[in-house]
Amino acid sequence: MIMKQEPTTYQPEEIEKKIYEICSHRGYFEIDGNEAIQEKNKRFCLMMPPPNVTGVLHIGHALTLSLQDILARYKRMDGYKTLYQPGLDHAGIATQNVVEKQLLSQGIKKEDLGREEFIKKVWEWKEKSGGAILEQMKRLGVSAAFSRTRFTMDKGLQRAVKLAFLKWYEKGLIIQDNYMVNWCTKDGALSDIEVEYEERKGALYYIRYYLENQKDYLVVATTRPETLFGDSALMVNPNDERYKHLVGQKAILPLIHRTIPIIADEHVEMEFGTGCVKVTPGHDFNDYEVGKRHHLETIKIFDEKGILNAHCGEFENLERLEARDKVVERLKENALLEKIEEHTHQVGHCYRCHNVVEPYVSKQWFVKPEIAQSSIEKIQQGLARFYPSNWINNYNAWMRELRPWCISRQLFWGHQIPVFTCENNHQFVSLDTPLSCPTCKSETLEQDKDVLDTWFSSGLWAFSTLGWGQEKSGLFNESDLKDFYPNTTLITGFDILFFWVARMLFCSESLLGELPFKDIYLHALVRDEKGEKMSKSKGNVIDPLEMIEKYGADSLRFTLANLCATGRDIKLSTTHLENNKNFANKLFNAASYLKLKQESFKDKERLNEYQTPLGRYAKSRLNSATKEARNALDNYRFNDATTLLYRFLWGEFCDWFIEFSKVENEAIDELGSVLKEALKLLHPFMPFISESLYHKLSNTELENTESIMVMPYPKDLAQDEKLEHEFEVIKDCIVSLRRLKIMLETPPIVLKEASVGLREAIENTERLQTYAQKLARLEKVSVISSKPLKSVSDVGEFCQTYANLENLDLSPLVARLKKQLEKLEKEKLKLNLHNENFVKNAPKSVLEKAKESLKTLLEKESKIKQELDLLEQP
């Protein structure tokens, strides 16, 4: 029989899929997956921000999911009944666009299909292609309760959306009104935060508006000359002496000769342009408010597709942006254009299709800002905490400026607004499809054609996924809402603080009377190693799936957590990933070494079972690492947790404990137990290698024993500070002795003996001597109280080490040092500072650099001369 040879390096691709499938199949990711270690009344709930059903895993997702999964795994191991709730967002605009393009490639328009047939096509696409991101999450090791995956268009969630709408409608918090909205001619109405502003180079057009006498004119500056057809007035500041005499008179609208009044309002900035502005209430947010104050007519000059209408005269049927150049040309022809200036300004674009957004008066459904008042007050009372804490300032600033939230969208795909109107114009909200009007019993009913903003349904995510309003429907577990609302923690990117987090806060508080979570952790953005935003055009995008393929999921998870310093953007490079793959390999080698050396491994869970000094020291350091890891995780300091685990496992365990074990062989079993416990600390960050190495050290296989993920997380136990200090002194002495050897050993000189002077006494100097002789590779190390007469020394933190020079032939070392002095002398000459002409004529920066180099060379020269003086003493 051919025996399978064990790999000599860590191979993540060989174990990750197998481990994940076993753990998933056993139900470890579910609410009661850790039932054996659950503690009474300990609950933890974490909601996955639902990615778009159209989405693929990008590095931002990978960061959010890694941090969430770290926390979920930690809480499971710590005895919490844990719900890590996954799901998908129906992504109204994005999904409709995907399916529309697919149909157009077949020559089919959605309008030809009609609403019902188009929605069927979307559901077909969703079942076939949607949700690929969920499978990609599993590659990352995400341990969400996938059997409970929710979709914002699920039957249960649709009911919650209708119920929320009904409750707010009945309270007067949802209204329908004509209002100025952000309008995308492709995607319809957008909320304020769905508009992305970009700085653009444009033009400022100075247009002449003649007065009624047709002799005098006013000049008005505008960036959008095509909107002049919607002007209802000209406006000046009442304090502007240039125009006071004109207030109350009329001006003639260029090109179409309609008369408009000249009004005064302090809204006008006298310094901008000419100090006289056009007022277009139908197509400007500020002008809309001015129009209401002055009772001006609101004129819409284009339709929902951006096509100019009859108000625009000869320009009717032109697209709004296409019309601009033609309007400017006609103004020039009629001597109505004073001048054009270059002008840089902010232009709003649709966050989805990047179309230029227009202010547009439209009849839409809105949620009133009053809905948020109670949640704002509770945040002020500290009932939810932001991490980092400075994000509360951003939240407060935005909430102070909260405007009515436009929730209606002109789409087919989404939650159709549950408002019905009968033939007698009675309007009502219904949770189910009504048979008749409750007011007049008319059976001729029409449902509102618009759908709700995607963020409306995702704003209910914290409780709609738990069965709110339909606990007894059979679609949800009856106890879910009671057990897991409020949720415990929210982890997401700061970029959706206003899109999603703020809305969840006020939606949840308004409907359930409690904030949806206690802690809100907002992470920064992932950028490239130079700190630049990743983009396909720059070619600097890091694909998480490719990184998993190359470096393993553990390396990616650990790297992202390690770089996630509070409040700072993450600068990610493949060097980080390579380093952490090396870290995984270091652990693999350490476990392989211990397994090779051990005769038998026995679990040693209790502190008093650690008998050897090295074992007790290693356990004490493990207890320290446990305390730090727990504290870091409890306070969302993911980078601190990874830093200390890296330091403990590589810097202490691999670099020192393993080395010490070569002297103290009987500690091998105990070091194995320490490493197994340390792997539990590491598990939330690196679930695959921790699982694999734990079983390797235990001589077990995951296939026939419990997973590390449902074992208790190590407890914070007492440390032996006295023993720890003793080993710190030993380590310091070894490092100092090694430096001494490097300084002295020049063939044929071999340092065989050295001595150590301690700044303060330790209990066991024999242990120090034993370790120092073996690990510094010396035949003899003495502990002394005074410096030998003829010796060279090295100074450590806790010690000073000495090499006696009396019995050594130092001539090779002296020759080496003299050669170094000659080399330094040549380097000094190359600096040219002895040359008066150079010093006089060299640029200041060059001269300063040369002087700095000379300073460094002189310092080296001084040290070498000191060593030579010591070595050449009689």
UniProtKB/Swiss-Prot annotation:
The keyword RNA-binding does not apply. The gene is valS. It comes from Helicobacter pylori (strain ATCC 700392 / 26695). SUPFAM superfamilies: Anticodon-binding domain of a subclass of class I aminoacyl-tRNA synthetases, Nucleotidylyl transferase, tRNA-binding arm, ValRS/IleRS/LeuRS editing domain. Catalyzes the attachment of valine to tRNA(Val). As ValRS can inadvertently accommodate and process structurally similar amino acids such as threonine, to avoid such errors, it has a 'posttransfer' editing activity that hydrolyzes mischarged Thr-tRNA(Val) in a tRNA-dependent manner. It holds the Pfam family Anticodon_1. It is found in: Cytoplasm. Its EC number is 6.1.1.9. Keywords: Aminoacyl-tRNA synthetase, ATP-binding, Coiled coil, Cytoplasm, Ligase, Nucleotide-binding, Protein biosynthesis. ATP binds at K536. Monomer. ValRS has two distinct active sites: one for aminoacylation and one for editing. The misactivated threonine is translocated from the active site to the editing site. The C-terminal coiled-coil domain is crucial for aminoacylation activity. PROSITE patterns: AA_TRNA_LIGASE_I (PS00178). This is Valine--tRNA ligase. One of its GO terms (molecular function) is aminoacyl-tRNA deacylase activity.
